[in-house]
């Protein structure tokens, strides 16, 4: 009997296309553990590939969004993508097992009927319909991912443009000399050029895969961000207090993206602080794994029921006064950037008592991140 069962087992060849940081997703970890340890009725072969190392796979399998799981064998090929890859796989494994019954043990059954009520042709049509539905869901996920990527990169362009405009205004008012002005504008134009290259990569690369984490001094990045926004706080007599320990460890992060997060949070804090108010920026070595950053203001605060929504895509809270425009897409971009780095971002606030935004950034580990 064991020999019969062994002959009935069919090879299931799967390919998981995912970047290294995506493999930390809980659903992907659960799926990999399931395929390695559970008996799903197949002899499973799971291959994994990083799209940054094998970009040809994106074109070969027509992938726009990753992670993606591809069933290579038995045919026909199927692609699973989106946020429910493991669930999709579990649903289809049952149907693949039914196919084995039809093509294997089913040889002794009546070919016209499988369950006594539906013909084999009806079941085949149902299978084809399910495949079409799954492909449609995958296509929608791809389009949504591409739209989200375009929105993220387009918003990133705003940061260097804002810095260049502020530098121009400061130079016209005589607040900075021409050499400083030229240096700021050149650096921001270089950044815009890099972002334009990112836009060209959107068709074949996820926004998250454009990140380039490195050994980074986060204190220096914060100091540069404060200087770039100096016109916003000097003109309004706002005090900025910093608390950055001299022994703060280096972090492992993308310099451009982390600078963008700090600029966005500082700009929001300045925008919601009244003239003559205060904004604080603090950093501390929370654990051996993380540096925690906090940016606080003494503005109008954020209602508790809105503190989760402000980090969602396409959510903009109503303006709090005639001079402020409300929190917008910048916070959703900040959340995505922080989460790609493996950290988290949150806000603590009470109405009329200001707001403190917190985020965590991974500490650079000499042995594992060189």
Swiss-Prot record:
InterPro entries: HATPase_C_sf, His_kinase_dom, HisK_dim/P_dom, HisK_dim/P_sf, KaiB_domain, Kinase_SasA, Sensor_HK_Regulatory, Sig_transdc_His_kin-like_C
Cell cycle as UniProt keyword: no
Gene3D superfamilies, A to Z: 1.10.287.130, Glutaredoxin (3.40.30.10), Histidine kinase-like ATPase, C-terminal domain (3.30.565.10)
CDD domains in the cross-refs: HATPase, HisKA
Broad EC category: transferase
This protein's domain notes: The N-terminus interacts with KaiC, while the C-terminal histidine kinase domain autophosphorylates and is probably responsible for self-oligomerization. The N-terminal domain stimulates the C-terminus to autophosphorylate.
NCBIfam families the record matches: PRK09303.1 (NF006800)
Name used for this protein in its record: Adaptive-response sensory kinase SasA
Gene: sasA
């Amino acid at each position: 009997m064991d020999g019969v069962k062994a002959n009935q087992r069919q090879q299931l060849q799967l390919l998981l296309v995912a970047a290294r940081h995506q493999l930390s997703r809980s659903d992907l970890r659960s799926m990999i553990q399931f395929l390695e340890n559970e008996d799903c009725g197949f002899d499973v072969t799971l291959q994994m590939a990083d799209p940054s190392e094998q970009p040809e796979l994106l074109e070969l399998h027509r992938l726009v969004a990753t992670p993606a799981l591809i069933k290579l064998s038995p045919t026909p090929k199927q692609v699973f993508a989106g946020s429910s890859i493991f669930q999709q796989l579990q649903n289809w494994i049952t149907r693949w097992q039914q196919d084995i019954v039809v093509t294997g043990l089913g040889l002794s059954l009546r070919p016209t009927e499988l369950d006594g009520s539906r013909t084999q042709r009806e079941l085949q049509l149902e299978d084809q319909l399910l495949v079409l539905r799954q492909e449609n869901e995958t296509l929608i996920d791809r389009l949504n991912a591409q739209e989200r990527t375009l929105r993220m990169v387009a918003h990133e362009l705003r940061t260097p443009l804002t810095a260049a405009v502020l530098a121009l205004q400061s130079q016209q008012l005589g607040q900075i000399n021409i050499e400083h002005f030229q240096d700021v504008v050149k650096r921001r134009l270089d950044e815009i050029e890099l972002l334009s290259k990112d836009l060209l990569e959107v068709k074949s690369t996820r926004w998250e895969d454009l990140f380039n984490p490195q050994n980074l001094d986060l204190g220096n990045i914060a100091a540069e961000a404060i200087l770039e926004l100096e016109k916003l706080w000097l003109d309004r007599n706002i005090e900025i207090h910093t608390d950055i320990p001299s022994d703060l460890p280096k972090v492992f992060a993308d310099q451009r993206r982390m600078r963008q997060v700090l600029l966005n949070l500082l700009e929001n804090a300045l925008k919601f602080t009244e003239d003559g108010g205060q904004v604080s920026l603090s950093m501390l070595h929370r654990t051996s794994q993380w540096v925690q950053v906090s940016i606080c203001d003494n503005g109008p605060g954020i209602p508790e029921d809105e503190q989760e929504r402000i980090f969602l895509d396409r959510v903009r809270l109503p303006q709090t006064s005639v001079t402020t425009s409300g929190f917008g897409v910048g916070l959703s971009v900040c959340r995505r950037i922080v989460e790609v780095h493996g950290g988290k971002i949150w806000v603590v606030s009470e109405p009329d008592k200001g707001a403190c935004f917190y985020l965590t950034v991974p500490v650079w580990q000499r042995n594992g991140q060189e």
